Amino acid sequence: MTIERIKDGESSLGGRPLFSSVVDVFREQAEKPPGGDSSIASCYRAVGSLIESDADFASFLRSSYEERPNMTPSHFVNLFFRGIQYIKMYGHDFDYVSYGDAFDWEPELKRLTTENRKQLQEILLTKDTATTVYQRYAGPKALVAALTNGRELKIADLGCGANYGLRGFELNEPFEQIENGFADPLNVWLERPLNLSEGLAVDKVNPEDPEVKYWIMACSFYPKELANVENVKQMEERLKQSKKVRFLQEDLISPTNIISGGYFDAVILSTMLYQHHPEDRLVILEEARRIVNPSGLIIVQDFAKKDFSEKSGLRFENAWFNNFGYRTFLSTGDQSDRFFEVFKWADGRCHQVRPGQDYPLVMSKAA
C-alpha cells in the first residue's frame, strides 16, 4: 500500500512531525471534522483512501508538506481543504457542498490534483489559512469592554484576516446571540460601545485585494455555512463606514519594528497562533508584548489551553469540534509571561460559552 511505502521511506525532518502525522490528522478529522461538516468529513475520508491507493496523489501531498518547513500537520490539512474549496468557489462550482460520501470526493480530488495541480500546489506552498469570523471577536470585545471602563483606547489586531474585528468594535457591530449559563454581564459588555481612538489591523496580505477576498471567503466558511455568505457581504458594506482603523501589511514572523513599542492599550491575536510553528508563535507573541503598554491587555483567542511547560504558556490543539477547546486568554503588559483563561467556547463559531478557569479572578476587576 502507498502509505506503507511512505512510512518506510520517512526520515527525520529536523524534529518536525513527519508526513505520517499529516495522514493521522486527515483520518482523525474524517471522524471529527471541523464544525461537524459532513462534506469535510467525506473529503478527508477520500484523502485517506487515495493516499493508500494512488501513489501520485500521495506523492503530491507529501512533497507539498515537506516543502513548507514551518507548517504544522493540522495547518496543512486545513490548508488543503481550503485550497480545494477556493478552486471550487472560484469556478462557481458548489456541488461539493452536498457531498456526503468519500466516493463523491475521490474522482473530484483526483481531477483537481491533476488539472489544477499547479494552482493547488501554489496554495499549499505559499498561502496560510485566513479564517475571519466576526463572532470570534465576542470574547476579546467583552474583555476589553469589561476591563477598560470606557476610557479612550488604542487597539491592535495582529493577524486581522478580513479586518472585521476592530472596525466592528468602532461601529459597535452587534454579535449573534450567545448561549451562556453563567454571566449575564457578557451581553452587557458586548453591547457596550468601546471608546476606540485608534485601531491598527495587521496582516501579511491585504484584505482589500480581490483575490485575497476570495481566499478569505474560502477559508471562513464550512461548506454547510455558504448560505450565510450574503449576510457577511452586507456586514462588510456596513464596516466600510469605519474611520479610525488603518491597515498595515506586515509578516508577523519577521516584524520590522515599524510599530512603536508600548503604544497600544490592547493587542488581540484571534485564531492565528494555532497554525504556526511553535518557534514562530514565540516571535509573534514577543511582538505583541513589545507594542502593548505596561498596563495594557494582550488577548489570545485560539484552540489552546494553559500549559506552563510550553515556552508560550499555551498548548495549541486541534479542538475544532464541540468540546469547549476554543478559548479566550488574557495576559497583561506587566505580567506578559502569564496567561489567564477567561472564556471557553463550545467551538470556533462562538455561540455557546462557559467561564474559563480564571474567569472569577479576571472579572473581579471588571468595571
Question: Model-derived features: where do they sit?
Answer:
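A short SAM/SAH-binding and catalytic strip from SAM-dependent methyltransferases
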Residues: 265-279
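Class I SAM-dependent methyltransferase Rossmann-like catalytic core
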Residues: 60-152, 164-173
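A short glycine-rich, Lys/Arg-flanked "PGG" loop and its adjoining helix->strand segment in the class I
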Residues: 281-297
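Class I S-adenosyl-L-methionine-dependent methyltransferase module
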Residues: 66-72, 93, 114, 146, ...
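Non-catalytic accessory regions outside enzyme or core folds
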Residues: 1-66
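Short acidic, S/G/P-rich loop/turn micro-motifs used as interaction or catalytic elements
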Residues: 223, 253, 273-277
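Class I (Rossmann-like) S-adenosyl-L-methionine-dependent methyltransferase catalytic domain
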Residues: 164, 213-217, 227-259, 299-367
